[in-house]
Swiss-Prot record:
Protein's gene: ASPN
Entry keyword set: Biomineralization, Calcium, Disulfide bond, Extracellular matrix, Glycoprotein, Leucine-rich repeat, Repeat, Secreted, Signal
Subunit composition and interactions: Interacts with TGFB1, TGFB2 and TGFB3. DCN, BGN, and FMOD inhibit binding to TGFB1. Interacts with BMP2. Interacts in vitro with type II collagen. Interacts with type I collagen. DCN can inhibit collagen binding.
Domain LRRNT: 66-102
Name of the protein: Asporin
Modified how: There is no serine/glycine dipeptide sequence expected for the attachment of O-linked glycosaminoglycans and this is probably not a proteoglycan. The O-linked polysaccharide on 54-Ser is probably the mucin type linked to GalNAc. The N-linked glycan at Asn-282 is composed of variable structures of GlcNAc, mannose, fucose, HexNAc and hexose.
Source organism of this protein record: Homo sapiens
Cellular localisation: Secreted, Extracellular space, Extracellular matrix
Residue stretches of each LRR repeat: 103-124, 127-148, 151-173, 174-193, 196-219, 242-263, 266-287, 290-312, 313-334, 335-357, 358-380
SUPFAM superfamilies named among the record's database cross-references: L domain-like
Region entry Interaction with TGFB1, spans: 166-212
GO molecular function annotation: calcium ion binding
Swiss-Prot/TrEMBL domain comment: The LRR 5 repeat can inhibit BMP2-induced cytodifferentiation and may be involved in the interaction with BMP2. The repeats LRR 10, LRR 11 and LRR 12 are involved in binding type I collagen. The poly-Asp region is involved in binding calcium.
Expressed in which tissues: Higher levels in osteoarthritic articular cartilage, aorta, uterus. Moderate expression in small intestine, heart, liver, bladder, ovary, stomach, and in the adrenal, thyroid, and mammary glands. Low expression in trachea, bone marrow, and lung. Colocalizes with TGFB1 in chondrocytes within osteoarthritic (OA) lesions of articular cartilage.
Length: 380
């Protein structure tokens, strides 16, 4: 009988911990970048192990003569700890837990009731790569909270009550998501020295054009910025020239001026849907010659924007739900076929006054197929 109980205990100890779907999603989200990150300071790594064993989330169980993982890892009460991931979401926490393992790479604290990040909450977490604090009640983050997290790459602060972007963020940060807070201003030195920052998501904040101080993005190489659902009345002119994606949907922009995109010549995706745009000045789109996708749906345009035929790489253009009453035969395609490097894969024109039978078939001569054009209930 004793032998049976002992075997049962060993079986239970060897069982894998249960991961909620949100944890699995977060793990997959950070998997690729984490595997590509050097981990030379990990004392547990063996030089003789293959690449699969060295990855943060190995596809097979770690090698052990007795058990597939440590029986007694240091882990905050109520949390799940595995493969240097500490999963503490949905626990009703009011503060950052103690006893977080020093070698933690990802810390998930979302869906709690944390109001403040204190100076020493992340002290000693020198290997921290991803920190998730979405959907808490944060109003304050201590200026020295990230002093020791010099390897932090992803910081998620969405759905909180922060009135400003935290100061002294790690210079290593590549992705900052601070969606749906109360941020009204981006100060000049907010991103100073953050040369690794590539993604900035800060939609659903009460930010207007005056809230972006001159020089706020000086020296940074951000590729993706989303400031949707804000209070912008025009395209911001002081964003990084390295931008590949700019999403300004659901604002109050009424006009696109000639100089608006002059700084963003590398732009490939532009989101201006659900604004109040009545006019796009001639020549303004010529400043983004590499653009591949433009969203202008749900605005107040009365005509097709000029300059589309000259955009050699444009593949997707959404113009539905506007006030367009006429479409010319050369509004989308160049007169010289060889000028177009990429054919259109999607053109949407439904919910406009223009009738489909009033458009000449040659209007869409540079699309991949008839199904690429959406005219409401009628395809081409």
């Amino acid at each position: 009988m004793k032998e049976y109980v002992l075997l049962l205990f060993l079986a239970l100890c060897s069982a894998k911990p249960f991961f909620s779907p949100s944890h699995i999603a977060l793990k997959n989200m950070m998997l690729k970048d984490m595997e590509d990150t050097d981990d030379d300071d990990d004392d547990d790594d063996d030089d003789d192990d293959d690449d699969e064993d060295n990855s943060l989330f190995p596809t097979r169980e770690p090698r052990s003569h007795f058990f597939p993982f440590d029986l007694f890892p240091m882990c905050p009460f109520g949390c799940q700890c595995y493969s240097r991931v500490v999963h503490c979401s949905d626990l009703g926490l009011t503060s950052v837990p103690t006893n977080i393992p020093f070698d933690t790479r990802m810390l998930d604290l979302q869906n709690n009731k944390i109001k403040e990040i204190k100076e020493n909450d992340f002290k000693g977490l020198t290997s921290l790569y991803g920190l998730i604090l979405n959907n808490n009640k944060l109003t304050k983050i201590h200026p020295k909270a990230f002093l020791t997290t010099k390897k932090l790459r992803r910081l998620y602060l969405s759905h909180n009550q922060l009135s400003e972007i935290p100061l002294n963020l790690p210079k290593s940060l590549a992705e900052l998501r601070i969606h749906e807070n109360k941020v009204k201003k981006i100060q000049k030195d907010t991103f100073k020295g953050m040369n690794a920052l590539h993604v900035l998501e800060m939609s659903a904040n009460p930010l207007d054009n005056n809230g972006i101080e001159p020089g706020a993005f000086e020296g940074v190489t951000v590729f993706h910025i989303r400031i949707a659902e804000a209070k912008l009345t025009s395209v911001p002119k002081g964003l990084p020239p390295t931008l590949l994606e700019l999403h300004l949907d659901y604002n109050k922009i009424s006009t696109v001026e000639l100089e608006d995109f002059k700084r963003y010549k590398e732009l490939q995706r532009l989101g201006l849907g659900n604004n109040k745009i009545t006019d796009i000045e001639n020549g303004s789109l010529a400043n983004i010659p590499r653009v591949r996708e433009i969203h202008l749906e749900n605005n107040k345009l009365k005509k097709i924007p000029s300059g589309l035929p000259e955009l050699k790489y444009l593949q997707i253009i959404f113009l539905h739900s506007n006030s367009i009453a006429r479409v010319g035969v050369n509004d989308f395609c160049p007169t010289v076929p060889k000028m177009k490097k990429s054919l259109y894969s999607a053109i949407s024109l439904f919910n406009n006054p223009v009738k489909y039978w009033e458009m000449q078939p040659a209007t869409f001569r540079c699309v991949l197929s008839r199904m690429s054009v959406q005219l409401g209930n009628f395809g081409m």
